[in-house]
Amino acid sequence: MSKNFKRVGAVAVAAAMSLSIMATTSINAASSPANKVYQDRFESMYSKIKDPANGYFSEQGIPYHSIETLMVEAPDYGHVTTSEAMSYYMWLEAMHGRFSGDFTGFDKSWSVTEQYLIPTEKDQPNTSMSRYDANKPATYAPEFQDPSKYPSPLDTSQPVGRDPINSQLTSAYGTSMLYGMHWILDVDNWYGFGARADGTSKPSYINTFQRGEQESTWETIPQPCWDEHKFGGQYGFLDLFTKDTGTPAKQFKYTNAPDADARAVQATYWADQWAKEQGKSVSTSVGKATKMGDYLRYSFFDKYFRKIGQPSQAGTGYDAAHYLLSWYYAWGGGIDSTWSWIIGSSHNHFGYQNPFAAWVLSTDANFKPKSSNGASDWAKSLDRQLEFYQWLQSAEGAIAGGATNSWNGRYEAVPSGTSTFYGMGYVENPVYADPGSNTWFGMQVWSMQRVAELYYKTGDARAKKLLDKWAKWINGEIKFNADGTFQIPSTIDWEGQPDTWNPTQGYTGNANLHVKVVNYGTDLGCASSLANTLTYYAAKSGDETSRQNAQKLLDAMWNNYSDSKGISTVEQRGDYHRFLDQEVFVPAGWTGKMPNGDVIKSGVKFIDIRSKYKQDPEWQTMVAALQAGQVPTQRLHRFWAQSEFAVANGVYAILFPDQGPEKLLGDVNGDETVDAIDLAILKKYLLNSSTTINTANADMNSDNAIDAIDYALLKKALLSIQ
């Protein structure tokens, strides 16, 4: 059959139906206005996410990382949460406000964040934080590549620069406490550390990653943020990570994930815009977001405030600022003694950048921070971030990893021949190598979505050029299958490096930097982020391929992956053998206990210090699969992915109010062609209704039922054109 049947044959299909139904004259007739279709999908997802029976939220109103408890990726348990999830909660509620006119849910998301994810004065006593010395922000401790090299010795002889923004912040807000989200929270107190070492209260501030780029989640040792030496070993968990010359003091410590705080600002901007359109106000939440953005500037600075591009020297102020959203900033201090510290991060990943948030915090009068340099610092960051993307854009269009001001985490000399960005060396996979931090496709869509929003709002020429090339690359990598499903890149790999950045010259094309798609998959969260990105880009640029692909991804997910709790797909977890066989490094001679009595000692496995997993409802199924030599499978409902899909539908509804789902009668499998395969699939469906089909296209007589009449009409239509 001719491939032209996609267009010509479809007309014949419609004509052949004239005996029993009214002729269809358009093969792409919209079924209903898109604002209604995609808005309804958003509202359906919102209802499922907020339904208490589905289990997305704790009794305190905190979103879990996932509904499922047996779950290891960046978090090591499904019922922890992250600042990432909290920022998506804000975004979800902002969109709900846009459609419902009710922004109380959005304000509540900020209240929950402030109560549970931003350490209060009880969690970071101002008596300790006020003793912070901006001229001596922290004591240097080298980083190592492998966990077996830890604990790391504190070294007071190494240069540490001056913190130039602390006085700005204390002057603006009248406190020495920091205002940012800690990145991970044990929502149900599963580990048993409790709040401030009480062992029982929930939620509980915890941490995991501490020991270099090769420390995967599977190799971490969970620890409390408030360490009174009550759990763990003689000195709690502190001497697993740093080696002090004296007795480790009882202390608190928190780590911020800058991309999440920036996403919170991003979501709050849209809530503010949409509220104003309806005569409403979210000004209290705007004030919180603006304050958070002010403190987020700590991520602009080298870890120990050393000079950018000259890291052997202590910085004297802003010469220690790279103006990028680095991997973290962190702070801590004494529990029963008055001292404190603050560090930035030397490592910068393109995936954490958010030029949209930088634009908001530097240009919107309502979002300009209170501090003296807040808005101007964010203005510099906006330009520096866009330069960073330009420097890292591969020949194909995908964005490569990042740069560090501290080679190997020890301020070693950047190897000869290494490309640099303002003196910082190119790193293919910044911060983490197991797995490589820029091998996950999700970084592409998370980060470029923010560039797309910036382009949509401002028309920035730099953002447009980045997106033009990136969109061309990714649109060529999306695969729509005959059965209505799809595949997008899952793992990507890199070859070569970018050209050394010259601000005057700008983007060179990076002929020696290449991306390769290693494998494809159906990550619904990433696909939703991709649809969101392409929607914003298409709305501003008019690129029809991007609009169509965004719509097709949204439709494919809705039609093929919806379930009673949201969307999901069966995932193969080839890494789950590490539950049983992954050793967690503990120095010889070090012993301690987890709150439940699990012994921490040399030779322990992941499961040995997380024995409560053996009580999980999915545990026996997973172990049985492993023992049978099979790869365990799961259906997972990650909060961020569910929210991303909901928001992406909302974005499409807003930006394309007149574009509904395309309808091609007879295209039962959704491959945009009507042929004998569709007839066969429809027959299979009639025999077994679990078969996946495009019901709108299969309903040949538009009676809202798929039955033998539709089969007969499709068969008649196909025969008439042969």
Swiss-Prot record:
Domain of life according to the entry: Bacteria
Domain Dockerin intervals: 661-722
Pfam families found in the cross-reference section: Dockerin_1 (PF00404), Glyco_hydro_48 (PF02011)
Signal peptide range: 1-29
This protein's UniProt keywords: Carbohydrate metabolism, Cellulose degradation, Glycosidase, Hydrolase, Polysaccharide degradation, Signal
GO molecular function: cellulase activity
UniProt entry tagged with the keyword Hydrolase: yes
Bias type Polar residues, positions: 154-165
Gene Ontology biological process terms in this record: cellulose catabolic process
InterPro entries per UniProt: 6-hairpin_glycosidase_sf, 6hp_glycosidase-like_sf, Dockerin_1_rpt, Dockerin_dom, Dockerin_dom_sf, Endo-1-4-beta-glucanase_dom2, Endoglucanase_F_dom3, Glyco_hydro_48F
PROSITE patterns: CLOS_CELLULOSOME_RPT, DOCKERIN, EF_HAND_1
Catalytic activity: Endohydrolysis of (1->4)-beta-D-glucosidic linkages in cellulose, lichenin and cereal beta-D-glucans
Region (Disordered): 142-165
Uppermost EC category: hydrolase
EC number: 3.2.1.4
Protein family: Belongs to the glycosyl hydrolase 48 (cellulase L) family.
Chain's role: Probable endoglucanase involved in the degradation of cellulose or related beta-glucans.
Protein name in UniProt: Endoglucanase F
Organism of provenance: Ruminiclostridium cellulolyticum (strain ATCC 35319 / DSM 5812 / JCM 6584 / H10)
